[in-house]
From Swiss-Prot:
UniProt source species: Glandirana rugosa (Japanese wrinkled frog)
Membrane protein topology class: Multi-pass membrane protein
GO process annotations (BP): mitochondrial electron transport, ubiquinol to cytochrome c
Function: Component of the ubiquinol-cytochrome c reductase complex (complex III or cytochrome b-c1 complex) that is part of the mitochondrial respiratory chain. The b-c1 complex mediates electron transfer from ubiquinol to cytochrome c. Contributes to the generation of a proton gradient across the mitochondrial membrane that is then used for ATP synthesis.
Subcellular location, principal: mitochondrion
Extra remark: Heme 1 (or BL or b562) is low-potential and absorbs at about 562 nm, and heme 2 (or BH or b566) is high-potential and absorbs at about 566 nm.
Protein name: Cytochrome b
Subunit structure: The cytochrome bc1 complex contains 3 respiratory subunits (MT-CYB, CYC1 and UQCRFS1), 2 core proteins (UQCRC1 and UQCRC2) and probably 6 low-molecular weight proteins.
One MF term in the entry's GO annotations: metal ion binding
TM annotation in the entry: 34-54, 78-99, 114-134, 179-199, 227-247, 289-309, 321-341, 348-368
InterPro entries membership: Cyt_b/b6_C (IPR005798), Cyt_b/b6_C_sf (IPR036150), Cyt_b/b6_N (IPR005797), Cytb/b6-like_sf (IPR027387), Cytochrome_b (IPR030689), Cytochrome_b_C_euk/bac (IPR048260), Cytochrome_b_N_euk/bac (IPR048259), Di-haem_cyt_TM (IPR016174)
Binding site for heme b b562: 84
Residues where heme b b566 binds: 98, 197
Pfam families assigned: Cytochrom_B_C, Cytochrome_B
């Protein structure tokens, strides 16, 4: 019998083992859909970003006007701009759900896949930050100034490092030009890193809600899960289209509709909503260097998850006390997001400090302690 082309062709064979004949646990829920929604978000960002880059001018005197020109004069330019801006928000919604699922069901025990995933999160955050600077509105300019200036907290090399990033003595034309370059190149670095993430995932196979070995109960990815993912694509793209057409500026900042000027500071400098939880942790530490370290650790703490997992059970499905603290962590992160968008005054300062302390406490102390306690109670 002639061999099936998808199993014999060198290129199609890779696609076949990754997306068609891939053995998949039958009991994975819709929480596993977010992993496949992320490449859709990435492709949408690259496609819209490419067309926007054709009309955008990375120059301080023209950047704001070029964005206005895209929205007013370019055919469907307003839609491209809105899809790109809101696409970033949907990207982060999918990322946070994907990480949340990984934490809940113990997916972090696939160490290589998890660590590459955390690196991907850092890359996506960096891309979102440099992309937010490009429209050159007030919040873009001051956000770039404040966040890049944090590097000056580094001992000895701090001020040199900041000037090296800026390309001068302040955020100016050189900064905007390099940020545009970074925004473009980082998307492709993310795409390459995603393939490595997928490669490591397919070495072990997917986990499942029970956290048990599922080798006895697997089906091929296509058609069962490919159609399930297709439903996710339709919902995601539909929601993105609705937001981008009916309420395109809902998640943006009004200050960014004012052209950047170094002569007046906005009343409250803050990043986009998806970075607010880390920004709140940064602000809750009164020392500059301490704040920068806390900001980095708020993401880096995810690297500790495979090390601090002390329970004999993988998934939180069978761990009621740990489950309660997982939801406490989610609530705490939402509180931090809210605090990051508030002015620096009481009671917001105190709430931010308590929430920041609790955030690290849950990751570093409470989760490993609960694992040991549950092992003892369950006698395993």
């Amino acid at each position: 019998m002639a061999p099936t082309i998808r199993k014999s062709h060198p290129l199609l064979k890779i696609i076949n083992v990754s997306f068609i004949d891939l053995p998949t646990p039958t009991n994975i829920s819709s929480w596993w859909n977010f992993g496949s929604l992320l490449p859709v978000c990435l492709i949408a960002q690259i496609a819209t970003g490419l067309f926007l880059a054709m009309h955008y001018t990375a120059d301080t005197s023209l950047a704001f006007s070029s964005v206005a020109h895209i929205c007013r004069d370019v055919n469907n330019g307003w839609l491209l701009r809105n899809l790109h801006a809101n696409g970033a928000s949907f990207f982060f919604i999918c990322i946070y759900f994907h990480i949340g699922r990984g934490l809940y069901y113990g997916s972090y025990l696939y160490k290589e896949t998890w660590n590459i995933g955390v690196i991907l999160l850092l890359l996506v955050m960096a891309t979102a930050f440099v992309g937010y600077v490009l429209p050159w509105g007030q919040m873009s300019f001051w956000g770039a100034t404040v966040i890049t200036n944090l590097l000056s907290a580094a001992p000895y090399i701090g001020s040199d490092l900041v000037q090296w990033i800026w390309g001068g003595f302040s955020v100016d034309n050189a900064t905007l030009t390099r940020f545009f370059t970074f925004d473009f190149i980082l998307l492709f670095i993310i795409a390459a890193t995603s393939l490595i993430h997928l490669l490591f995932l397919h070495q072990t196979g997917s986990s499942n809600p029970t956290g048990l070995n599922s080798n006895l109960d697997k089906v091929s990815f296509h058609p069962y899960f490919s159609f399930k993912d297709l439903l996710g694509f339709i919902i995601l793209l539909g929601a993105l289209a609705i937001l981008s057409t009916f309420a395109p500026n809902l998640l943006g900042d009004p200050d960014n509709f004012t052209p950047a000027t170094p002569l007046s500071t906005p009343p409250h400098i803050k990043p986009e909503w998806y970075l607010l939880f880390a920004y709140a942790i940064l602000r809750s530490i009164l020392n500059k260097l301490g704040g920068v370290l806390a900001l980095l650790l708020s993401i880096m703490v995810l690297f500790l998850m495979p090390i601090t997992h002390t329970s004999k059970l993988r998934s939180l499905m069978f761990r009621p006390t740990a489950k309660a603290f997982f939801w406490a962590l989610i609530a705490n992160t939402i509180i931090l997001t809210w605090i990051g968008g508030q002015p620096v005054e009481d009671p917001f300062i105190s709430i931010g400090q308590i929430a920041s302390g609790l955030y690290f406490l849950i990751f570093v102390l409470i989760i490993p302690t609960l694992g040991l306690l549950e092992n003892k109670l369950l006698k395993i």
